[in-house]
Amino acid sequence: MGRFLNPGNKAFQKTLKSEIYVDKTMLLAYTNKVIGSDMACICNSRPRRFGKSITANMLAAYYSRGCDSFDMFSTLKVGRLDSFETNLNKYDVIHIDVQWCMMDAGEVQNTVKYINNGILDELIIAYGDVIPDTVKTAYGAMSYINAATGNTFVIIIDEWDVLIRDEANNKELQEEYINFLRGMFKGTEPTKYIALAYLTGILPIKKLKTQSALNNFEEFTMLDAGALASYIGFTDDEVKQLCKKYDRDYEAVKNWYDGYMLSGKHVYNPKAVVSVMMRGSFQSYWSQTGTYESLIPLIDMDFDGLRAAIISMISGNEIKVRTTTFQNDMVSFKNKDDVLTLLIHLGYLAFNQKNQMAYIPNEELRNELMDAVEENKWDEIMQFERQSIDLFNATINKDVNTVAAKIEQIHMEYTSVIQYNDENSLSSVLA
């Protein structure tokens, strides 16, 4: 076993020993269906604490020939399938955690070289007799290995987008990284040596102009989770079972932590659900995820309508969002829709795929956004609060003219033109 090549199953073994483990191994039924096909390159993006690393470790444990995982998986859901053993521990797996590599590389500028050389060194140890001394890249080595042995690889990249997010202004490093990924996955040779590729991170694959930098990948995102919706977070049935086991109020859990609708399925934040099961306290666990510090600069961006849109969603409205212009990075914002699209990928907003509307999914996230805007002392939110107080006082005093005028004012200011005549937007104003 190596650090990159066939790392084994110990990481996933620790997950299985957790107090709460929700079985998501049926994802393997999907990957087993597409492995070795032209749909075998997958990018599954989701917010922090939605189980990305656990999934990556599960895939490595299942496919890696560097370990024996039969006993580990035979008692799980995937173990019931007739095809369970077909691909079990049959492949050379390359598993890369870019976040860890970035830290261990010493200088962030060395990250890509560190990853390439680390993989290449381990491939030479395992297959040195078929790799010429002139080969300088990991993907070049895999090409030679495949040509000589016929072996194919499962490549798993966890936190694939960390260099895109954390080094947003380092164009030289980003270009080097994108070129490395293209060498690994794009072209005729990669189709020969790749059995399966699985990238996971917060952001979808970076766009170059209007096209994905890796347009041969099937993307599953918070905008469109497709067939992987059930594996992105906890489902309604899974949460009901946990509430029963830990004697928690299901309706309260639903109010606090539900709200994402992915391909028609209710999806909950796993981190929050596990925390409330273990602690019994209904509170916001989101600020513990590490993305809160990135929220305030985003919502403070000077785009027309951004603050009004956020205040409108805090009050319960949905907002129309055009998601197609977002470049899948942290710097190329052209309008409020790009910012709102990023907030969807970060998990602060949910997205209704049918009507292309964004909304705040639950009480936990509403509190987070309220804290953020109040911390920044937005004039708009203070004005909104004053209007709400005036409306309340007018209602108590039975001043029907003022009540009508205030409702009309708030409805005009915090409801989009598209939604103005929608009864849900008016009910949100009244709420």
Where are these regions (language model features)?
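Phosphate-binding site recognition
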Residues: M1-S428
